[in-house]
From Swiss-Prot:
Catalytic activity: 7-carboxy-7-deazaguanine + NH4(+) + ATP = 7-cyano-7-deazaguanine + ADP + phosphate + H2O + H(+)
Cofactors required: Zn(2+)
Positions that bind Zn(2+): 191, 199, 202, 205
Domain of life according to the entry: Bacteria
Entry's Gene Ontology BP terms: queuosine biosynthetic process
Transmembrane residue ranges: none
GO MF term (any one): ATP binding
Entry protein name: 7-cyano-7-deazaguanine synthase
Binding site for ATP: 7-17
Cofactor note: Binds 1 zinc ion per subunit.
Record's function text: Catalyzes the ATP-dependent conversion of 7-carboxy-7-deazaguanine (CDG) to 7-cyano-7-deazaguanine (preQ(0)).
Pathways per UniProt: Purine metabolism; 7-cyano-7-deazaguanine biosynthesis
Length: 222
C-alpha cells in the first residue's frame, strides 16, 4: 500500500510519517518551501524522511510572500509570543496561512495519483487550540469529497483516502504516540521564529514545551 505523507519536519507530521510506516505503507513524502519564516523546518523534514527511508521525498517550491497575509510569510508582521493556551484559543492567530492546507493537500493529491497511492496522511490536529480552520474534522471531510469528485481515481475506482490520525489527539497524546513509534524528537522542528535554536516563546514552541512538561519529559530541542 502506497501513501503520500505531508511532512513539515514538525512534531505532528513526523509522528504521522512514522505512523504511516507502522501501518505498513510504502511512504512518499512531500514538503513545501513557500518562503516561510521558519524555512529551517525543511532541514528537519529531510532528516526525518531519511530516518524512515521514504521511497521519495519531494520539496515543492512556491512563494507565498508575494501576498503575505500571515506572520509566517510576512516578516513585517510580528509573531505572537509568550501566550498561554487560553489566549491562543480566542481567535484565529496571525500565524494562520490562508488556505495553506488546501494548497498542500492539492499537491499531495496530484502526487498520490501519479504514484498510484491509496492514502494521503496529514498531521492536522484540532484539540490543542481552536486556531486554524483547516485543521478541523469537518474540513478534512470536505477535502475527502474533493478527492472523490476531482480525480480520475475517485471517479473510476476508489478515492484516495485522507488519513488524519492525530485529528482528535491532544499534544501530550501525540508525543506519547511518537515515543511508542520511536520518533527522534531531536531531529524535528516546531519553532515559527526561524532561528538556529527554538525561541521557546512562539505559540508552536509553547504548545510543544508545555506538552513535554506535562508528561514529565524533557524536550531535546529546549
Amino acid at each position: 500500500m502506497k501513501a503520500v505523507i505531508l511532512l513539515s519536519g514538525g512534531l505532528d507530521s513526523s509522528t504521522v510519517l512514522y505512523q504511516a510506516k507502522a501501518d505498513g505503507c510504502e511512504c512518499y513524502a512531500i514538503s513545501f518551501d513557500y518562503q516561510q519564516r521558519h524555512l529551517r523546518e525543511l532541514d528537519s523534514a529531510k532528516k526525518i524522511a531519511d530516518t524512515v527511508g521514504v521511497i521519495e521525498h519531494h520539496i515543492v517550491s512556491f512563494d507565498l510572500r508575494s501576498w503575505g497575509g500571515s506572520a509566517l510569510t510576512d516578516s513585517q508582521i510580528d509573531l505572537p509570543s509568550d501566550r498561554d493556551l487560553e489566549e491562543m484559543s480566542q481567535n484565529i492567530p496571525i500565524t494562520y496561512v490562508p488556505a495553506r492546507n488546501t494548497i498542500f493537500l492539492s499537491f499531495a493529491l496530484a502526487y498520490a495519483e501519479v504514484v498510484n497511492a491509496s492514502r494521503v496522511y496529514i498531521g492536522v490536529n484540532a484539540l490543542d487550540y481552536s486556531g486554524y480552520p483547516d485543521c478541523r474534522p469537518d474540513y478534512i471531510l470536505a477535502m475527502q469529497e474533493v478527492f472523490r469528485l476531482g480525480t480520475r481515481q475517485g471517479r473510476e475506482g476508489e478515492a484516495i483516502a485522507i488519513v488524519a490520525p492525530l485529528i482528535e489527539m491532544k499534544k501530550t497524546e501525540i508525543i506519547q504516540l511518537g515515543n511508542s513509534l520511536g520518533v527522534p524528537w531531536e531531529k524535528t522542528w516546531s519553532c515559527y521564529a526561524g532561528g538556529e535554536k527554538p525561541c521557546g516563546i512562539c505559540d508552536s514552541c509553547k504548545l510543544r514545551l508545555t506538552a513535554f512538561q506535562e508528561l514529565g519529559l524533557t524536550d531535546p530541542l529546549m
